[in-house]
Amino acid sequence: MSQAALNTRNSEEEVSSRRNNGTRLAGILFLLTVLTTVLVSGWVVLGWMEDAQRLPLSKLVLTGERHYTRNDDIRQSILALGEPGTFMTQDVNIIQTQIEQRLPWIKQVSVRKQWPDELKIHLVEYVPIARWNDQHMVDAEGNTFSVPPERTSKQVLPMLYGPEGSANEVLQGYREMGQMLAKDRFTLKEAAMTARRSWQLTLNNDIKLNLGRGDTMKRLARFVELYPVLQQQAQTDGKRISYVDLRYDSGAAVGWAPLPPEESTQQQNQAQAEQQ
């Protein structure tokens, strides 16, 4: 190969090499430009999304059947955590825990965020079937909880009493005895169980029953059997049944009380009408 041809070939290779290097450098520069743009854009977008002034959680939507919970209860629970976060930064689990701790009558709460600035909260309240030891309420599953007294003052519920931690046991006894009494149109107004498992009941007509320990259903059946006789005697004597002590193998001790003035007058008028 001649020297001229060799020089030409070397020259072409140098040009090609420079072109390849230039292309490679351009590719690297383009890639760096793209990466820089993505990073900068991502940083800007993230900063924008985290800016509480741009995406504050400013709307509150409450759902679920509510009897005791007010809108302000939820609002104050959230504000107690501090300034609300943004859509991206606010942890809904923290809000959920806060509501459950501050509002003991809430059975279940779910919190979720709705783009761009909405907080949706669904509430499920406990449903009371009786009052428990005056200060609390109890639901059908035996869960005890408290509600501000002023929000339950108009509710007429039976009263249950028992040692701490005995709500389920008292509730079960209340149901069983209530079912037996309902057959004879009695309603339980109060049911109390002592630490020694001794039972005292108050009926809707304010008659108090002392059942003692053990054989409570048997003793309750005895009262149902005796009641017509006792009621007849009460009407004859112009008195009312105050209490019936059934802590005996048979029979019962009965306490009597004067009739209220209105009932006494009504009974006298009825007796006079019958004589005429």
UniProtKB/Swiss-Prot annotation:
Effect of residue 125 to K: Impairs localization
Side Periplasmic, residues: 49-276
Membrane association type: Single-pass type II membrane protein
Role this protein plays: Essential cell division protein. May link together the upstream cell division proteins, which are predominantly cytoplasmic, with the downstream cell division proteins, which are predominantly periplasmic. May control correct divisome assembly.
InterPro entries: Cell_div_FtsQ/DivIB_C, FtsQ, FtsQ_C_sf, POTRA, POTRA_FtsQ_type
UniProt-recorded name of the protein: Cell division protein FtsQ
Gene: ftsQ
Keywords: Cell cycle, Cell division, Cell inner membrane, Cell membrane, Membrane, Transmembrane, Transmembrane helix
Location of the POTRA domain: 55-126
